[in-house]
Every structure is written in structure tokens, then in C-alpha cells.
From Swiss-Prot:
GO terms for cellular component: host cell Golgi apparatus; host cell nucleus; viral tegument. This is Inner tegument protein. It is found in: Virion tegument; Host cytoplasm; Host nucleus; Host Golgi apparatus, Host trans-Golgi network. Its main location: virion. Plays an essential role in cytoplasmic secondary envelopment during viral egress. Interacts with the capsid via the large tegument protein/LTP and participates in its transport to the host trans-Golgi network (TGN) where secondary envelopment occurs. Modulates tegumentation and capsid accumulation at the viral assembly complex. It comes from Epstein-Barr virus (strain AG876) (HHV-4). The keyword Nuclease does not apply.
Length: 1240
């Protein structure tokens, strides 16, 4: 039987920040019993033994074993002379049922029935028969639990969408939460039960509009509303595909701005070498259409790499209805990548205006469906989901839009009016939909989902603030500056509040149920631990503790002796001397003569709680002694002391501090609904080496459950600070009321423990992001170096007129003279060209070279854009929520009472990552602006156009001996203007490079050395008809992408904060390095080396790097400490090769050692092989590639395999006919087999 707990293990993306700490303690109830027997009369040891049941869960199967339950109850009976064990024994049925869980094992309803039978047999006969008013009565709880199990069984069998509603003390049971979550999972699994009204389908004016809606609905298996136009059949789907291919593929005819001969739905692939390089969303749309058409016509589906992209023209763009705004992803993708297919700007802006208005209306409908609800509402969740799904927005579509927007530089949004507003609305809607649909499958009023939903809400809030800050501040790079002045309407402010509607997922804590339970507990310690459990499960503050109405009375002779001792209470001076003599964590037994004194609470707070807590916060004690001291402060004298509001208020936050520090060091017991498999490793470790728990693994006690587990929540440090602040107020009140108030030192807390806990919390995140940023920048440098030679050659190729001989079909490419290139004179003499200044090749080879240059450039631009998007996603997922907590820590009121403030360095890390992303976007923009990016489509478009005149008309003109008609008037030569921007002609090295990397046929003539053909004119014509060789002229563009990358980096240096440069000033007269991304001292703080290698007993207060250590060699050789000669100050027009001086990887003495980490798919194979053989050792201590490294190609799977997963399978006609859809809704595969009545 599968457990109900496993059904709640999904949790969406927000679960990483809300995950409870660790796996279940091995041994369960048997281990607790064993530790309880070993505790003896030590109250702190008893507390330690029962802590797994107080804060965690154990397997429900343990309760089904009578021997385990009997041994546990007998052990409690031996300790019933103490108030805490006596209170547990009195309500043992509630105590055990509260922590019981379906757990990781195969426990089902049969085990639950057996457990209830065992507990029923353990109840005393006096309480088993009559009904009592006690809400924690065992027989009452067992009866209510049986009724809940029967209701759950009926709900699951009927499958009507009903959910389990629970109230009273049973709502605090772990397994009841799991049953409730399972009924909600069944409800969301069957959603939507009613048909969806796809209004875009009914409003569509074209076959393409109806096709897009049909593919979306059928692929995701969404039901159609009966009131609509009707669900298309398999024959309808085939007919739509045939019509789109046969009747629309060749052009719409008469479209405004339509290119001659190219106005159809499908355009040629813009890159034949990689499907990633050419508009993936548009290509996927084309694959869907052509795949169904191939099956309908009995043909074969073409290869993905040969499929054209789905395009548009002016006529079709006008016919796209705004109601289907979210179905036109291929249009937005093309516009953001500057692909207009000849459509006029006026048509594009009118289209964008309609789409922006429709998206604003959709956002308003979402807001209306969510309403003003501020807490969990299943009805509102269903309404919002219906609105989003009907409009065409689900989790998959939202993810596609998020990736598309993240991979495109923000400057690309400023070309047309309304494009910025449309992109901003798409960003807000897709971000909201991602959070919404990730929370939907596991939404339930349980503590597990409450933690997930709270983490997701806080993350969405932090992302919205970050997005608003980036939008209002504007880009700081010069290349992106125009975006701030050409923004469309509605882009200045946040277009829509995408955070508030998520409140419908926020689950309010069941405070009333816990109040009812707490009011019936007789032990103050048991009551306090109940509220600690409440705070930990629901991440909500507990109410102020109430004063117990009567002191705890203990049975037997011991109770009489304690009461007699209380009568003869010691005076104040003796009590204070007694409290001074106590040793925290070591004195086991309390003396009733002093503990029951009315002076004991104030003396214990002043002489024990204050100094002991100072020692714990100063990190002077080892982990084990710190936990023991906190346990002792909580439990010492708790069974004997008189009721005291001061001591009760002081011990409650101490219990919370103990539980939180425990889970940070070693991991506390698991919480209800948590999958143990999901918490075995730290969720923030991107490198796969979980060493963050080393601080707690050394010398960990077996009974503490030591192990390398992660944290329970994202605000653990803040919870400790809140608790310390609460204790501070109590200590201040106590000291101010004493006679020594004037002599008491000021209340100040050390910060070493906070520094250590913060280091443990974020060391993995900081180190992973630091390494990812380094690799990202190294990949950018490598890409700039490799692609700059290609863009430089393309620039030089189109900077001079190319001479074409129509009779021989040869093209003469100008080469540099001896004065321009003295180093290649010997190579020139080997050329077979008729002129030493030209290189001869045929026209088809030139076309292949032109196409290859554009393909390689676009492939590099697309891959780098994806790598930049992955880095931006990594920052948004890990760093943005961490920044929110770090800022909360820095602004916490507790720092007003500390010896020195804590300065988290996540702000500096954020600045580094932001600057790296800005440089990444600038590189993407430089690639898009290079001449090679549009080499075929614009620069050499004339080569690929149909001939302007056919042979018959040419012969007629020749026979008539007439001058050419106006159509033959040669176009004016667009030669480059003179000056610094005029590049040198193409060199022979460029020819060899293009022949080796782009088209081998270009240099085949050098190997064969054929003789130049001798041609004799057959006829001669009059001067009026003799035409000079056609000159193919182009407009020059910038050659060097590396120059743009370097110039951006150099200019960016003026905007960097001082934290990004060396702390020491430059010598007088010496120019500081222009670009310094990761200096040694600052990088040391980011890597948090002191958190990794320093003593586990003391954390550094200033987080400064150690003078010596394993990172020193890495820091000293950091590839980002560039010298002033790394980037040339020459202008871009002086040539691309000049900008390559000092670039890493050159193979000389100045080559950077970090070249070993370059991704293999960006560099050449020879370079990769050379690096692999010459650099057997790596400086990086980690060998597993980070996500950003894999995204850029390094260390990932084969390129073909990676690209194969880029596009989902198309919708086949057979699948549509049989209703077997290839894509499954999120959440359907997460459903485990539900618990049944069978007992394994």
C-alpha cells in the first residue's frame, strides 16, 4: 500500500525553500523507548528522548504493534512521578496519534485500523466506557478517527471531488493531514471536470487560429464545453493541417509588405546546423502542422532540422484575433528576435496594441476570479484555473514564455511601440501562471502545503520587487540604454499585480484547534512544546503563554516531600547563590528547597538564562554542549518550580531556539507530509557534494540523529533572532526590577552564532552561484574569441565589391595587398587566382559560405541566449529569495542590542551576478547586430533572389540591339565610406579559416592547383550592350563581437560599486585594471571558505578570508583579474583581429589557466582536445558542471540528444482520432496508489 504521505511529495518549485529538514529517525517508537529508559532521572535527557515525538513523526505501523506500545507506556509509568512524563502518560492516545504518519513505509488504512485497536486496548477501563468532556479523551479520539477513515474511504471510492473536512484535536494529527491532502489531490487530479470554453476558437477568423487552439486543447486533454462550436474530430484536424500546408503555405496573396515569392506560412530554416538556432517555438508550431499533414497524406514526417518555421505576413497578422493573444507565441518570438518577414511597422504596432489590451483584460479577469480573498479558497483556485486554461495559459506555455523572455535582451523590446508593454504583461502573466500551476496539484489545507505556499508567495513577492526595480532603474549598459527611452505604453510601472492573487493558496494555521489542545494539558513544558510544534509546522508565531492556574502536584511520597520543602522556602540571597552555583547542561537534579522559592524565576533568568544564552550565541561551546545547555535551560526544575509568568515566557522562545538550532546543525525529525527521499540531500547544493552538514556531523550524538541534512525552512535564522529578541525583553524586565539594575551591564548579544548559521544556510548557494558566474563569464570570453574571427571575416568579405563573371560563373573576392598584409605574401603566391589581389571561386561556393556564416553566428547567438537565460533563472530561483531573508536579517531590530552588526555579503554576490548578466545580454546584442547574423537574409540577399530576367528576354534584347530596359539599371554601389570604419580586405588567412570551418569547397582549389581556363568571346556587341561584370556590393558592419563585449565591460567598470574592485588603491600614475569581476578578497567572502574549513566551534565575525587556505591558489589565479591590456582601446573599426590581442586561450604565455573550464561545444575540437591533454588537473575543487555550465554546452549530453528534447512530439492524426494524447497534465503522474483496507 502506498502511503498518503507520498502523495504530497510534489510541492512544486516552492518546495525547495520550504522543505523540512531530514529523513525519519531510524527505529521510530522503539528508539524513543530505548532513549527514555536510558534517561533515568535527568529531566534534560527525558526531554531529549521525547523530542522526536514532540517535533516530528514516526511510522503508523509502530502503533499497530502491541509490544512497542506496551513498552513505551510502561517506561512512562516508571517516570510518572515527574510532571512532564505524567502528562504524556495521561493523554498518551493523543500524544501518539499526533505524531503517527503513513510515513515512508507501505502503511495504509488497514494499519490505521490495527493501530486504533491497539490504542483502544491500552486505555484504562474507567475512561473507555463513559463519554467525558475531555477533548483529549482517548476513546473519543479513537471514535473520531474511525469516522474520518470511513469518510475518506467513501470519498476515494466515489471520486466525486469531495474533500475531507476536519476540526477539533484530530486536525493536529499528522496522518489526518495526509488523508486530507490525498482527497484534495484527487480533486485537482480530475480538474477540470467541466468543459472549457475556448473563446479564441469561436472568434478565430482563420484556419490557423482554430488550429492553434485545437492543438493546445487536444495535447493537454482538456474537455470542451458543450455550448461552444464543438470539439474538432480527427478528420477535422487532418483537414485543417492539409489546408494550412496546401492552401496557405505558398502565400496569402496580396499581403501588405509581402516579400515577393516568400509570403507563405512557412519559411526556410534559419539554421540547418542546429534546431536551437532558429526560433524554437515557431519551428515547433511548424512541426505540429507538417507532422499531421504527413500522416494525412500518407507521407513521412520530415526531419526536425529540415522543417521550416511558422511565419506570418501582414495579411495574416491582421486576421489574428486578440482573444487568442496567448496562442501567438511564434509571433512574439519572431518580433523579439527581430524577424519581421517584411511586415510594415504599422501593422506590427497595431497587432501589439490589440494583444496588450487583451492581456490586460485577462489579468483583470484573473484578479476578479481571485477576488479579495486572503486565505485558502478552493473555489477561487478553480475559477482562476478555468480563466487561465481557457485563455491558453498552462504551466508548459508559461514556461515557454518565461524562457523566451529571459533569453532575449531587454533592448530588443524597444523596437516597436507596445512591444515593451506586451512583453511586460507576458512576463507577469507567465510568472503568475508558473507559481499558480506549480501550487495547484498539491493545494490543501495542511501544514505541508502551508509551508510550500508561503515559500512560493514570498518568492513571487521577491521576484516582483526585483522585476520592478530592474524596470524602474533601467539598464545600465550603454548598449541597452535606448530601451529606457523607447518603451511602450504601460511599461514604466508594474503592469499587473501578479502576487496578490496567490493569496488564495495561503493556508491559515489552525490556532483554535491548538488552543483547545493546549488548554487541556497539565504540564507547562508539554504545552510549550506543543506551541513550538505549531510554530515549526505552520511557520506562525505562537500566542503569548498563559499563566498556569495551579502548580503541578506530584503523587506519592516525593510530592509530599516537595510540598514540605516549598513551605520552608529559602531567602532571596540563598536562592541567588544557588542559581549562581548551577552549571548549565551539567546539573541534573534540582533542589526543591530553592526551585519552589518565589525568588527562583528571577534569579534563574538573571544568573543562568542570560549568561548561558550569551555563551551559546557567541559560539564558544561545541555543538553538542550548546544543544545540551539549551535543553537544560528549558527543562531544569520544570516539574518543581512554582507557576511563574516570567519563567514561562522565557522558556518558550528558548525551546524554539533549541528546536531551530537542532534542525540547522543535525536536522530535527521530519514533519507531516514530507517525502523522506526529498530531504536526504541539501536542496541548494548545485554541485552534488553535500558538505554543509559537516559542522554537525563531527561529534554528533547518536540520540540527536546527526547527519548531513538540510534546513527545515528558509527563515530559520530569522526565527532564532525573533526568539532571542523575545528573551531579551524578558531579561531586561527582570534585571530592571532587581536591586542591581544600575550595576548591570548593557544587554548586548554576540553575533558569532548568527554568522555561523547564516554561513551554513547560504554557503552552498553563494559558492554555487559564484562558480556558475565564473563559468558563465569564461564561456562568454571563449565564445567572443571564437566568434569574433568569424564576424571579422564576414565584415571584411562584404567590405569590398565582389566581381562576378556571368560567362564563367566565377566570383573574384578582393584580397589584401602586400602593404596591408605582409605576413601572408608567401601564401598569396600559391594562389591560382588570375590576380594577386583576388581569390577566385564559383558562385555556389560563395552561397554556401554566406549561408554557413549566418548559420554559425545564429547558432552561437541562440546558444548564448539560452545560457544567459539559465543564469538569470538560477539567480531568480536561488538568490532572489535569499536576498529577501538576508535583508530581513540585516534590518532586524535585534541588531540594536548586539555587539557588532552582521553584514551578509549576498548583496555583493547579487551585484556580481547582475553585472555578469548585463555583460551576457550585451554579448547577445552584439551578435545580433553583427553583419554575420543577417549575412544571407540581408547582406547577400541579392544572391538568393530569383533572376531579374530570364534567358528568352535577354536574347530578345540582344537581337534588337537595344539598351536594357529600366529593370536592368544597375543598383547604386553601396561601398563603405572612407575613414576609420573601413576595414582591410579579406586576407588569405580568412579564406583558409572559412574553408576549414564553414565550407571546404572554398579551399579545394588550393589542393588541386588547376590551370585557369582560357575563354574567348564568341560574339562582340556594341558598347551600348557590353555590360561590365556585375558587382555584388554590400553594406559593411561591425566585425568584432569581442570588441563589443570588451568595450561593454570597460564601460561597465565606471558603473561598478567599489565592492567589485580591489580594496587597495592603484599606485600613483598607474591605470587600474578596466574590468575586475571577482577580486580575491571579495570572492573569498562569496565562497565562504571560513564556513567550510574553519573551526566548527567559532565562526568568523567579519567573514574575511583566511590568510592561507585551499582557495588561495584559486583566487590568485582567477581568470577575472584582467590586466589593462586584456581589452584593447582601439575603436571597433580598426579591425577585428586587433581586438583579439591578450585574449585567453591564445596558447602563449598570456593564456589564462581558466581556459581548461571552457565548454567543449563552443570551442573547437582541437582546442578542447589540447586542453584535455595538457591540463590533467583542474583548479576548481568541484568537477560536476553547474546548471549554467551545462546550459552553455559544457559537460552536458550529446548535442543531438539535447536538441531532441527541445521540441515535444507533434500532434499526430492517429493520436487525435483515438483521443490518446501525448502530453499529460501536471499532477496526474504524481498520484500514488491510495491506502486501502488491505493490511500487508
Amino acid at each position: 500500500m502506498a502511503s498518503a504521505m507520498e502523495s504530497d511529495s510534489g510541492g512544486g518549485s516552492g518546495g525547495a525553500d520550504a522543505q523540512p529538514p531530514l529523513a525519519e529517525v531510524d527505529g521510530g517508537l522503539a528508539r524513543v523507548t530505548r532513549q527514555l529508559l536510558l534517561s533515568g532521572d535527568d529531566p534534560a535527557a527525558r526531554l531529549r528522548a521525547l523530542m522526536p515525538l514532540e517535533l516530528g513523526i514516526f511510522g503508523l505501523g509502530d502503533l499497530a504493534q502491541p509490544v512497542l506500545v506496551r513498552d513505551f507506556l510502561n517506561t512512562l509509568t516508571l517516570m510518572s512521578g515527574h510532571a512532564y512524563p505524567a502528562a504524556v502518560l495521561r493523554h498518551h492516545a493523543y500524544y501518539l496519534l499526533r505524531a503517527a504518519s503513513f510515513s515512508r513505509r507501505s502503511f495504509g488504512l488497514g494499519h490505521l485500523e490495527a493501530a486504533l485497536d491497539v490504542l483502544a486496548s491500552s486505555l484504562p477501563p474507567t475512561t473507555a466506557s463513559p463519554a467525558t468532556d475531555d477533548p483529549l479523551d482517548g476513546s473519543r479520539l479513537i471514535a473520531e478517527t474511525r469516522a474520518l477513515a470511513a469518510t475518506y474511504r467513501r470519498i476515494i471510492e466515489e471520486g466525486s471531488g469531495e474533500v475531507l473536512a476536519v476540526s477539533g484535536p484530530t486536525a493536529t494529527f499528522a496522518f489526518v493531514e495526509e488523508l486530507v491532502a490525498d482527497t484534495y489531490l484527487a480533486r485537482w487530479d480530475a480538474f477540470p471536470r467541466e468543459g472549457l470554453s475556448f473563446y479564441a476558437f469561436n472568434a478565430a477568423k482563420t484556419t490557423l487560429g482554430r488550429w492553434l487552439v485545437t492543438v493546445y486543447a487536444e495535447t493537454n486533454r482538456y474537455p470542451w464545453a458543450a455550448a461552444g462550436q464543438g470539439q474538432p474530430t480527427a478528420a477535422d484536424i487532418k483537414a485543417m493541417a492539409v489546408e494550412l500546408v496546401e492552401h496557405s503555405g505558398g502565400g496569402a496573396g496580396g499581403g501588405e509588405g509581402e516579400e515577393s515569392g516568400g509570403g507563405g506560412l512557412f519559411h526556410r530554416p534559419e539554421s540547418l546546423s542546429s534546431v536551437v538556432a532558429s526560433l524554437p517555438l515557431a519551428r515547433r508550431r511548424a512541426v505540429e502542422i507538417l507532422g499531421v499533414y504527413a500522416e494525412a497524406s500518407g507521407g513521412q514526417t520530415p526531419p526536425v532540422a529540415a522543417v521550416p518555421v511558422l511565419a506570418f505576413d501582414a495579411a495574416r497578422l491582421r486576421l489574428l484575433e486578440p482573444s487568442g493573444a496567448l496562442f501567438y507565441d511564434y509571433v512574439y518570438e519572431a518580433l523579439l528576435w527581430d524577424q519581421t518577414y517584411g511586415v510594415p511597422d504599422s501593422v506590427i504596432e497595431a497587432f501589439l496594441a490589440g494583444m496588450a489590451a487583451e492581456m490586460e483584460a485577462l489579468a483583470a479577469r484573473v484578479q476578479e476570479a481571485a477576488g479579495s480573498r486572503a486565505s485558502f479558497s478552493p473555489a477561487a483556485i478553480e475559477q482562476v484555473a478555468t480563466v487561465l486554461l481557457s485563455a491558453g495559459l498552462n504551466e508548459t506555455v508559461a514556461g515557454d514564455y518565461a524562457m523566451m523572455l529571459a533569453s532575449v535582451p531587454r533592448v530588443s523590446r524597444s523596437r516597436w511601440r507596445w512591444l515593451e508593454a506586451t512583453a511586460a504583461l507576458l512576463e507577469s502573466l507567465s510568472g503568475f501562471a508558473l507559481h499558480f500551476f506549480r501550487l495547484l496539484p498539491t493545494a490543501s489545507p495542511t501544514s505541508r502545503f502551508a509551508r510550500v505556499a508561503r515559500a512560493a508567495y514570498l518568492r513571487a513577492e521577491a521576484e516582483a520587487v526585483d522585476r520592478r526595480a530592474r524596470r524602474t532603474s533601467g539598464p545600465s549598459t550603454p548598449a541597452a540604454a535606448p530601451a529606457a527611452t523607447a518603451v511602450g505604453v504601460g511599461a514604466a510601472a508594474d503592469p499587473w499585480d501578479a502576487v496578490t492573487p496567490l493569496r488564495i493558496f495561503i493556508v491559515p494555521p489552525p490556532a483554535a484547534e491548538y488552543e483547545q489542545v493546549a488548554g487541556d494539558l497539565s504540564s507547562e513544558l508539554l504545552r510549550s512544546l506543543l506551541w513550538v510544534r505549531y510554530s515549526r509546522l505552520w511557520q506562525a508565531p505562537a500566542p503569548a503563554p498563559a499563566l498556569p492556574c495551579k502548580p503541578p502536584l506530584l503523587p506519592g511520597e516525593q510530592g509530599r516531600r516537595q510540598w514540605t520543602a516549598a513551605v520552608a522556602a529559602a531567602p532571596r540571597t540563598d536562592v541567588e547563590a544557588y542559581c549562581r552555583s548551577l552549571r548549565a547542561g551539567q546539573t541534573a537534579r534540582a533542589d526543591p528547597a530553592y526551585v519552589r522559592s518565589p525568588f527562583f524565576p528571577a534569579a534563574f533568568i538573571e544568573f543562568q538564562i542570560w549568561p548561558a544564552l550569551r555563551r551559546v550565541l557567541s559560539n564558544e561551546l561545541p555543538k553538542t554542549r550548546s544543544l545540551a545547555a539549551l535543553r537544560w535551560l528549558v527543562s531544569f526544575g520544570s516539574d518543581l518550580a512554582l507557576p511563574s509568568p516570567e519563567l514561562t515566557r522565557a522558556r518558550r522562545p528558548l525551546e524554539l531556539i533549541y528546536a531551530t538550532v537542532w534542525e540547522i546543525y543535525d536536522g530535527a525529525p521530519p514533519m507531516p507530509g514530507e517525502s523522506p527521499q526529498a530531504v536526504g540531500l541539501r536542496p541548494l547544493n548545485l554541485e552534488g557534494e553535500g558538505k554543509a552538514g559537516d559542522a554537525g556531523a563531527e561529534g554528533a550524538e547518536d540520540e540527536e540523529g546527526g547527519g548531513p541534512w538540510g534546513l527545515s525552512s528558509h527563515d530559520a535564522v530569522l526565527r532564532i533572532m525573533d526568539a532571542v529578541r523575545e528573551v531579551s525583553g524578558i531579561i531586561s524586565e527582570t534585571i530592571s526590577a532587581s536591586e542591581r539594575a544600575a550595576e548591570a551591564p548593557p544587554l548586548a548579544w554576540p553575533t558569532s552564532l548568527f554568522s555561523l548559521l547564516f554561513t551554513l544556510r547560504y554557503s552552498t548557494t553563494a559558492e554555487s552561484l559564484g562558480l556558475a558566474t565564473r563559468r558563465f563569464l569564461v564561456s562568454g570570453e571563449t565564445l567572443s574569441e571564437d566568434i569574433s574571427r568569424l564576424t571579422g571575416a564576414a565584415w571584411r568579405l562584404c567590405s569590398r565589391p565582389l566581381l562576378y563573371d556571368a560567362e564563367t560563373g566565377r566570383v573574384q573576392i578582393p584580397l589584401a595587398t602586400e602593404e596591408e598584409e605582409e605576413a601572408v605574401v608567401a601564401v598569396k603566391e600559391k594562389s591560382v587566382s588570375s590576380s594577386p589581389r583576388h581569390y577566385s571561386t564559383d558562385l555556389q561556393t560563395l552561397k554556401s559560405v554566406v549561408e554557413g556564416i549566418q548559420d554559425v553566428c545564429r547558432d552561437a547567438a541562440a546558444r548564448w541566449a539560452l545560457a544567459t537565460a539559465d543564469t538569470a533563472t538560477l539567480r531568480r530561483r536561488l538568490l532572489v529569495p535569499a536576498l529577501r531573508e538576508s535583508r530581513g536579517i540585516a534590518d532586524h531590530p535585534l541588531w540594536a542590542h548586539t555587539s557588532e552588526p552582521l553584514r551578509p555579503d549576498l548583496e555583493e554576490l547579487n551585484e556580481r551576478v547582475e553585472h555578469a548578466l548585463e555583460l551576457g545580454y550585451s554579448l547577445t546584442g552584439a551578435l545580433r547586430r553583427s553583419v554575420a547574423y543577417r549575412f544571407r537574409d540581408y547582406t547577400f540577399a541579392r544572391l538568393f533572389q530569383p533572376p531579374a530576367i530570364d534567358a528568352e528576354r535577354a536574347e530578345a534584347i540582344v537581337r534588337r540591339d537595344a539598351r536594357p530596359p529600366p529593370v536592368f539599371t544597375p543598383a547604386p554601389r553601396r561601398l563603405p565610406q572612407g575613414g576609420a570604419d573601413t576595414p582591410p580586405p579579406l586576407s588569405m588567412d580568412d579564406i583558409l579559416y572559412l574553408g576549414k570551418s564553414i565550407c571546404k569547397a572554398l579551399v579545394d582549389v588550393l589542393d588541386h592547383h588547376p590551370a585557369a581556363p582560357e575563354t574567348t568571346p564568341i560574339k562582340t556587341y556594341t558598347p551600348a550592350m557590353d555590360l561590365n561584370p556585375e558587382q555584388i556590393t554590400v553594406t559593411p558592419r561591425s566585425p568584432s563581437v569581442l570588441a563589443a563585449f570588451a568595450r561593454t565591460a570597460r564601460v561597465q567598470t565606471h558603473h561598478l560599486v567599489p565592492a567589485l574592485t580591489d580594496d587597495s588603491p592603484s599606485p600613483v600614475g598607474q591605470t587600474p585594471p578596466p574590468f575586475r569581476i571577482l577580486p580575491a578578497k571579495k570572492l573569498a567572502a562569496i565562497l565562504l571558505g571560513n564556513g567550510r574549513n574553519a573551526s566548527k566551534r567559532r565562526a568568523s565575525r567579519d567573514l574575511s578570508p583566511p590568510p592561507h587556505g585551499r582557495w588561495r591558489a584559486v583566487l590568485d589565479s582567477s581568470p577575472f583579474s584582467f590586466s589593462s591590456s586584456d581589452f584593447s582601446d582601439q575603436d571597433e573599426g580598426e579591425g577585428g583581429e586587433a581586438d583579439l590581442r591578450g585574449v585567453p586561450g591564445g596558447g602563449g604565455e598570456g593564456a589564462y589557466e581558466e581556459d581548461r573550464e571552457r565548454p567543449s561545444d563552443i570551442d573547437t575540437a582541437a582546442r578542447a582536445q589540447k586542453v584535455e591533454t595538457s591540463c590533467p588537473r583542474r583548479r576548481s575543487p568541484r568537477t560536476t558542471p553547474s546548471p549554467s555550465r551545462r546550459a552553455s554546452g559544457g559537460g552536458g549530453p550529446d548535442r543531438g540528444e539535447a536538441e531532441a528534447h527541445t521540441y515535444p512530439p507533434y500532434l499526430s492524426a492517429a493520436a487525435a482520432a483515438s483521443r490518446v494524447r501525448p502530453r499529460t497534465r501536471r499532477g496526474a503522474t504524481r498520484r500514488p496508489p491510495r491506502p486501502t483496507a488491505e493490511d500487508e
